[in-house]
């Protein structure tokens, strides 16, 4: 569906990605409806897809997806573990509704159950594995897009994208290419630019391998030695030196700290003692009065009113 346009043709970079992910390798068995997409057969019995036809059907599927007004009405389904992560990533970038895992029977036909949905378009990973949603879609006239291998059944499939559905990398790459073309047709990303989302995010990852990688990362982090911090010393260095220097000068100069501490004698320099007047007599001590009201006036209550 490139229409002979140079901008829609398959690029060398996309061909390299497909060959690296073994997208061109099919199965040994062949469905008669898939023979038109086969380029040749190898000596070991493996069928090889024509990647140009794969690209043309991918563009057709992207145009059908981009034509749907509300992206949430597009359902992407994968019951196989290899395609569940790719389906979730595709839905996150395009706004489609993902169904990763087991499909609930009757979700498209039984209006009584809570999981009932009415999609406008259905995209499945493998027609052989996702047979139930394809069959229900045929009952309610929902168009179906499917990634098909050489031996995949094409019954009720409207747009078949020929590719290798047995490889986890091939499934992830095809979902990545489909998401990129949909975003290009919508105008979300430029066609002549590079999409900043790497294809590795669409690949399947074994949970055991992920757990092993996390464990190895924790062990590596624990093996890194923690720098030891030396205790801080709060002692004042050189205290004896400045104490001896002040003693040689004849005393300590008064400061505001001496006034704030009551009862602490103030030490003045020895050079200033000779200048003081030593002839002054101390003041006479005042003997306290024995009468408790001696200092008060005689009529101390006259300030109040008479009848209080």
UniProtKB/Swiss-Prot annotation:
Subcellular compartments: Cytoplasm
An example molecular function term from Gene Ontology annotations: structural constituent of ribosome
Gene Ontology annotations of biological process type: ribosomal small subunit assembly; translation
Positions of region (Disordered): 283-308
A Gene Ontology cellular-component term: cytosolic small ribosomal subunit
Transmembrane segments: none
Keywords associated with the record: Cytoplasm, Ribonucleoprotein, Ribosomal protein
SUPFAM superfamilies xrefs: Ribosomal protein S2
Start-end of Polar residues biased regions: 299-308
Complexes and interactors: Component of the small ribosomal subunit. Mature ribosomes consist of a small (40S) and a large (60S) subunit. The 40S subunit contains about 33 different proteins and 1 molecule of RNA (18S). The 60S subunit contains about 49 different proteins and 3 molecules of RNA (28S, 5.8S and 5S). Interacts with ribosomal protein S21.
Function: Required for the assembly and/or stability of the 40S ribosomal subunit. Required for the processing of the 20S rRNA-precursor to mature 18S rRNA in a late step of the maturation of 40S ribosomal subunits.
Family according to the record: Belongs to the universal ribosomal protein uS2 family.
Listed name of the protein: Small ribosomal subunit protein uS2
């Amino acid at each position: 569906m490139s229409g002979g346009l140079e901008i829609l043709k398959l690029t060398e970079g996309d061909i390299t990605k497909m060959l690296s992910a073994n997208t061109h390798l099919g199965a040994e068995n062949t469905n008669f409806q898939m023979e038109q997409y086969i380029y040749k057969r190898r000596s070991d019995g493996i069928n090889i897809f024509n990647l140009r036809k794969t690209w043309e059907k991918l563009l057709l599927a992207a145009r059908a997806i981009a034509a749907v007004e509300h992206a949430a009405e597009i359902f992407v389904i994968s019951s196989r573990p290899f395609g569940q992560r790719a389906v979730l990533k595709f839905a996150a970038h395009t706004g489609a509704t993902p169904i990763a895992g087991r499909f609930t029977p009757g979700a498209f036909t039984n209006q009584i159950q809570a999981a009932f949905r009415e999609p406008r378009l259905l995209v499945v990973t493998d027609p052989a594995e996702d047979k139930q949603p394809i069959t229900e879609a045929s009952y309610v006239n929902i168009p179906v897009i499917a990634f098909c291998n050489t031996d995949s059944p094409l019954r009720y499939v409207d747009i078949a994208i020929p590719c290798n559905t047995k490889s986890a990398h091939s499934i992830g790459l095809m979902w990545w290419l489909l998401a990129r073309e949909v975003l290009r047709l919508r105008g979300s990303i430029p066609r002549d630019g590079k999409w900043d989302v790497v294809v590795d995010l669409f690949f399947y990852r074994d949970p055991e391998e992920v757990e092993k990688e996390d464990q190895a990362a924790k062990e590596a982090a624990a093996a890194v030695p923690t720098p030891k911090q030396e205790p801080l010393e709060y002692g004042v260095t050189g205290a004896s030196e400045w104490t001896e220097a002040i003693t040689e000068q004849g005393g300590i100069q008064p400061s505001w700290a001496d006034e704030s501490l009551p009862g602490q004698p103030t030490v003045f320099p020895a050079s200033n003692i000779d200048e003081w007047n030593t002839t002054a007599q101390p003041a006479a001590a005042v003997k306290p009065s024995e009468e408790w009201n001696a200092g008060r006036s005689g009529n101390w209550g006259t300030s109040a009113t008479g009848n209080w």
